């Protein structure tokens, strides 16, 4: 017997419903808490969604946030946020900061004068400073991007539910929908709680999470459908447990490979896409959890058609066949 | 039993080889890029090549594929602008141009409608008061005779102007159908002009696209800053030559009918009163090049086309000793006095400009004027170093992720894990091959998409392997187990990947720039990973099985 790494024992018999008040309760609590946090803290929208300018600065001298702020004070730019950026991929002489300026009142278009003034003021503080990236988004576009993002998430949810409904049953579609909303809400809650920058790429990350989470859920559903045909007399709850147990090894393995690859990117991929990668990584964990603990609970509550082998019109014949 | 038809084997291997061949140039990115640039330059020069170009061209054999993955702005560095065309501006000039015609038409009927007068109105609307309110119907029908049908598919059947009357006031404006048609034309023209201007500067692979009804997206790799790009495309560059009526220092003084007061470029307190109708416009230029004036100062030399030259010659010979103004974007650049008739059809613009300015003005005049002003809604500049840092970080992260996944797969599934890893490597190659072949753009989130694919690509294999393990437990022999494993895993693989593809499709529609790049790599990754995970691993597995004929297998 050659050595095999087994993340999950060959045969498991875990009762996934045993603690369902705890697990589903926790999910419900986290989802509700996320809504509360979203309302209390709000999301830390990037310029994609609220307009404004971000300037990335890089210098051989260490970043002095106070001095930067003082230099920008006389320009009267309103809300200015300056943060130093740290990253393991930076060299020793690489000191990076991010300056964010909110959209200027009454200016629909982006004003290059503002950017030039900011750059000049910062150069005064630190002559070696350079500006590797400058991005400005006008309030008009940012308003539209918010709507596009909302539509995209809604359209994805609708399209996936519809597909699941076609391929399975409406109860499965509801289960998938609930677990997807759960994933999106909690991920957004984490973004609101830690005030991580939320921009267009975060939306892309959210959609990716949807894709991954549904992928996981579908594998469980597929096995469930198969087992429902195989074990016609077994209570639904047990068929579900059996299906999750049978696919558990695959679920853990796939999440494992995906997480390993993503963690490599999270650590080594640089700070520019860290928020994006963080959202996906977090979402994969929560998505895996929800496909095991959320989606099928909903299906269990809604109940499901038990006889998959025949058309409903065959009921009479089925009765005869099943008769002793 | 386990079997793959010979033609399927050839097809699978052929597709892999083809994909990898298309991907290969990306391993020698710099060299192939130099080769491609040299080939394009030599072709543009009509076959003649400098020694450097010849060397660059020889750096990559011509018979090999030479398509590369385009790097997005966030990886290559460059400028991105989103501009909105102020289409309503054109309505005003259309109505202003119509006024003399309408005035003429109404003047012909002076006997019945009495005297007429143009009154204050919002931009793009013409209001005319007539003396005899009871004759307003006659005035309306007279103006309506000037209407022409709208020249567009959607607006067919409607006329270009709308005439209405209230009391003694006549209101004329463009009809909605004509406005739509005009908007469309204005944006098309602007797009064309922007493209010509960017091409004149000769940067590599600019992207200039129309977005929505009235926006233009401009992406130029390798340009230093968005400001530089804006200076080039944000200027309207409307050049006219107008007769000078008077000069003065009061911009508020009354200009008189048909005249305008415009400021001087150099002296802000100096104003010219000009006739509004130009003698010649920039549209009649055939060429403009930077040069120097008699004092050695930077200037732009221009040449008129024959009809422009004729008009200019006629005007100058009739007005020797009079000044005329060269007007650029509503500012008087200079107002020389005509010393003698200029019949050669060429001239010079001099004034306050440096050599860069002269160069830029020449480019702008050659490319033509924008029909309407552009407003910039979004602008992004990414420095090339930042892009290179991102590429390096992405490369290291992908490698580490790849090795970790391979390690985990081999540790978990042994020899079968090796098969899956080989398929994974081929999958990576295929992603790059497809990206190169379809000329897609790789962005930073796109790299994340590839890393995500590395992790998720093995999913189909994991599903199959887990199934084979289960089937082995029921002990029906290894060949049967492998076959059943594939059969039973198929529906899960298909459903799981189609749902992900749906998401990728929506992402593509939502996306601008980087997000779109992510959607593209994700979609390609899904398709190639299903192909490699199902067919390539199966081929490897079956080939191994046929050679060894193992009695038992261990997954």
Where are these regions (language model features)?
Chain A
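A structural signal for conserved, well-ordered secondary-structure elements
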Residues: 1-324
């Amino acid at each position: 017997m050659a050595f095999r790494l087994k993340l999950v024992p060959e045969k498991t018999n875990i009762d996934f419903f045993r603690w369902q008040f705890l697990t589903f309760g926790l999910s419900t609590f986290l989802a509700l808490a996320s809504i509360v946090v979203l309302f209390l803290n709000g999301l830390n929208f990037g310029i994609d969604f609220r307009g404004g300018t971000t300037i990335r600065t890089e210098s051989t001298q260490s970043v002095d946030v106070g001095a930067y702020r003082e230099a920008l004070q006389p320009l009267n730019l309103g809300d200015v946020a300056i943060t130093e950026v740290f990253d393991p991929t930076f060299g020793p002489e690489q000191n990076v900061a991010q300056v964010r300026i909110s959209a200027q009142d009454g200016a629909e278009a982006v004003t290059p004068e503002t950017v030039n003034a900011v750059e000049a003021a910062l150069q005064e503080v630190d002559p070696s400073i350079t500006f590797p990236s400058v991005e400005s988004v006008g309030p008009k576009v940012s308003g539209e991007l918010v709507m596009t993002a909302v539509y995209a998430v809604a359209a994805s949810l609708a399209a996936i539910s519809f597909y699941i409904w076609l391929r399975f049953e409406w109860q499965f579609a509801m289960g998938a929908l609930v677990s997807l909303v759960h994933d999106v809400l909690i991920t957004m809650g984490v973004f609101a709680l830690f005030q991580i920058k939320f921009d267009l790429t975060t939306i892309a990350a959210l959609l990716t999470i949807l894709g991954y989470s549904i992928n996981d859920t579908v594998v469980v559903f597929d096995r469930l459908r198969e087992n429902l045909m195989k074990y016609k007399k077994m209570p639904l709850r047990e068929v579900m447990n059996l299906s999750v147990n049978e696919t558990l090894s695959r679920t853990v393995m796939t999440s494992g490979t995906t997480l390993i690859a993503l963690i490599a990117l999270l650590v080594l991929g640089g700070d520019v896409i860290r928020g994006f990668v963080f959202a996906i990584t977090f979402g994969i964990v929560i998505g895996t959890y929800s496909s095991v603990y959320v989606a099928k609970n909903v299906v269990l509550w809604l109940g499901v058609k038990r006889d998959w082998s025949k058309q409903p019109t065959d009921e009479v014949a089925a009765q005869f066949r099943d008769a002793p | 039993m386990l079997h793959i038809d010979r033609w399927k084997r050839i097809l699978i291997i052929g597709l892999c080889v083809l994909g990898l061949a298309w991907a290969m140039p990306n391993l020698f990115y710099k060299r192939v890029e130099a080769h491609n640039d040299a080939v394009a330059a030599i072709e543009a020069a009509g076959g003649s090549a400098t020694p450097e170009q010849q060397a660059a061209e020889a750096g990559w054999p011509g018979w090999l594929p030479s398509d590369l993955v385009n790097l997005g702005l966030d990886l290559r560095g460059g400028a991105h602008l989103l501009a909105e065309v102020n289409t309503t501006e054109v309505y005003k000039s259309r109505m202003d141009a119509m006024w003399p015609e309408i005035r003429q038409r109404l003047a012909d009927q002076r006997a019945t409608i009495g005297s007429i007068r143009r009154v204050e109105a919002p931009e793009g609307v013409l209001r005319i008061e007539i003396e005899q309110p009871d004759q307003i119907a006659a005035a309306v029908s007279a103006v309506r005779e000037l209407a022409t049908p709208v020249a567009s598919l959607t607006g067919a059947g409607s006329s270009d102007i709308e005439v209405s009357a209230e009391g003694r006031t006549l209101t004329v404006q463009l009809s909605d159908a004509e406005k739509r048609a005009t908007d469309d034309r204005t944006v098309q023209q602007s797009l064309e002009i922007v493209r010509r201007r960017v091409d004149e500067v000769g940067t590599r692979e600019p992207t200039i696209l129309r977005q929505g009804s009235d926006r233009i997206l401009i992406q130029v790799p390798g340009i230093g800053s968005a400001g530089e790009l804006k200076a080039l495309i944000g200027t309207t560059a409307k050049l006219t030559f107008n007769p000078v009526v008077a000069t003065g220092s009061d911009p508020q003084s009354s200009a008189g009918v048909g005249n305008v007061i415009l400021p001087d470029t150099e002296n802000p307190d100096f104003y010219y009163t000009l006739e509004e109708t130009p003698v010649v416009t920039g549209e009649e230029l055939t060429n403009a090049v930077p040069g120097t004036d008699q004092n050695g100062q930077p200037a732009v030399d221009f040449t008129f086309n024959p009809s422009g030259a004729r008009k200019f010659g006629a005007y100058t010979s009739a007005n020797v000793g009079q000044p005329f103004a060269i007007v650029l974007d509503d500012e008087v650049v200079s107002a020389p006095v005509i010393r003698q008739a200029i019949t050669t059809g060429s001239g010079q613009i001099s004034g306050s400009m440096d050599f860069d300015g002269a160069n830029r003005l020449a480019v702008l005049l050659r490319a033509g004027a924008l029909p309407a002003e552009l407003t910039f809604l979004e602008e992004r500049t990414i420095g090339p170093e930042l892009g290179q840092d991102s590429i390096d970080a992405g490369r290291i992260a992908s490698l580490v992720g790849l090795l970790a996944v391979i390690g985990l797969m081999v540790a978990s599934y042994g020899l079968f894990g090796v098969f899956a890893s080989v398929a994974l490597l081929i999958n990576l190659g295929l992603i790059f091959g497809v990206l190169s072949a379809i000329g897609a753009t790789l962005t930073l989130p796109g790299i994340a998409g590839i890393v995500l694919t590395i992790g998720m690509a093995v999913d189909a294999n994991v599903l199959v392997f887990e199934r084979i393990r289960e089937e082995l437990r029921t002990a029906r022999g290894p060949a049967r187990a492998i076959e059943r494993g594939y059969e039973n895993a198929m529906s899960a693989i298909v459903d799981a990947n189609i749902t992900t593809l749906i998401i990728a499709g929506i992402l593509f529609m939502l996306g601008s720039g980087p997000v779109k790049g992510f959607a593209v790599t994700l979609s390609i990754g899904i398709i190639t990973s299903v192909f490699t995970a199902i067919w390539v691993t199966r081929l490897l597995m079956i080939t191994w099985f046929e050679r060894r004929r193992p009695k038992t297998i261990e997954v």
